[in-house]
Amino acid sequence: METFDLESHLQDAYSRFPEAKHQPIIGLTANYEGIDATLRDRYYKQVIAAGGTPVIIPPVADAQVIVNTLEHLDGLILTGGGDHNPLWMGEEPSPRLHNINQERDAAELMIARLAFNCQIPMLGICRGIQTLAIALGGKVCQDIKQLVKHSQDADRTEPTHIVEIKKDSTLYNIYNKEKIFVNSFHHQAVSEPGNHLRTIAKSSDHIIEAVESSEYKQILGVQWHPEWLEEEGLKIFQWLVNQANNFYAAKQLHKRILTLDTHCDTPMFFPQGIKFDHRDSRILVDLHKMTDGHQDATTMVAYLPQPQIGESFSSKVAFDVKGPAQYADLIFDKIEEIVSKNSQYLSIARTPADLYSDKRNGRKSIMLGIENGLALEHDISNVKHFAQRGIVYITLCHNGDNDICDSARGCNTHNGVSSFGEKVIQEMNRLGIMVDLSHGGEKSFYDALDISQTPIVCSHSSSRALCDVPRNLTDDQMRALAAKGGVAHTTLYHGFLRKEGEADIMDAIAHLEHAIDVMGIDHVGLGTDFDGDGGIRGLADSSELINFTLQLLHRKYSEQDIVKIWGGNWLRVMTQVQNFKH
């Protein structure tokens, strides 16, 4: 230290404004020995060298403490250390098990899972890769069979064996090499990465040396110690800091904009007694998941299954009701009960102004819709009834023709919209309710477009050019919709994104970008269909919706365009429709 004058040390900060540029906040888990929480300096020095601000996290297995800590982090490093207690994996201890650290196990497994829920970028180092695996449903071998020496006697800065890297991996993108030299200090290793991770590197004796997210999340685990490998090791820390910076940018963006999902079917699970204020594993949308994914609002629909000829409606639903209208009312009653029980955090919104008010006041919003005009029971007065209940749209039909129009999966009963359906659309226009043609047949779509005096919408519909199923929209339909000022929102139902293989977030982005190419940025958005079989790898539930934003930022969409995609276009149409009310 050159001087012991405090003022001179502060001068660098005091001589400019702001006093410091933003740097991503990177949490590092501490070791625990005796009564000391400790961390070797190489970890935090590499974070600083990579451009991050390190914060050491003590091993405290208290969910309140952990959640509050994670709220301030942009990235997380799970550091090295002793063995995990195998009981966390449901296993008895091997005779070769070394010292375990009970102070760390519960705390770090909780941190890893909760950070995963929040989509926080993570790096696991040595013990840390094993923490990731255990926390996310994988397995760790308690004592590996070594054909290569994995616990070196050489100095920690000295690489002693080779790691072979898969080319389609984050690690390859970091090093641009299929083989790198690493140090090694372990006798345990990941044996099964589980569903959320995939193996991306192995040693020559087939020990797993690195894993990454299998869901396009920013998660990387390495079995070696890059903090000791100077410039070569720094590259991994730079990767994490870069991802943390992107995550920070996405979080800040979500604070400024409104994020609206235009279609979810969570009420389908009401008969199971779901708890919206719990992180309920039975549903994809709840207060926890919306908060983790930085989602402001969703549109919950009363979905009414279309009976086949000879079937009764009551035989197709779990609640004892007289008919479709009473069923829809019951669903809305139950949504109102949920909101009433959680009124500090949740509200029903009926207009764009309500949504923005809820966001300013720190509440999540639910908008109401009807999926299948069967709810009207061939009674035009029920349009007014449901308008008074606060619905914002009616999807005219579902899977099967009804008395309003023909379905994409129908029998061409009316050759499009029926005469009753025409009256329904006109009444919806009069009462300020959006006309939704998701599930509608192609002739029904064009009829509705001609009949409606306000723009129509497709709350959850993807592109037939990319996935040729009748339920998706053709390019001509998209162009016609855009010409009338309407919007079509990409959905996350796997069968509407691809016909073969597993759909993932990249398929959803491809459908969105195709819609943008065809219709323009002013006519697109996202309608997940969560809890109605929507949900794909990378966008599996509401907690993962910030990953959608990260993909948009990665593709250099402007904030203005992201606002439009995240509901701005939809709310423009809603405003037009509601202003037409007369």
Predicted features by range, described:
Residues A249-T413, D468-H489, Y493-L526, F530-H582:
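N-terminal hydrophobic targeting/anchoring segments and the immediately downstream early-domain regions
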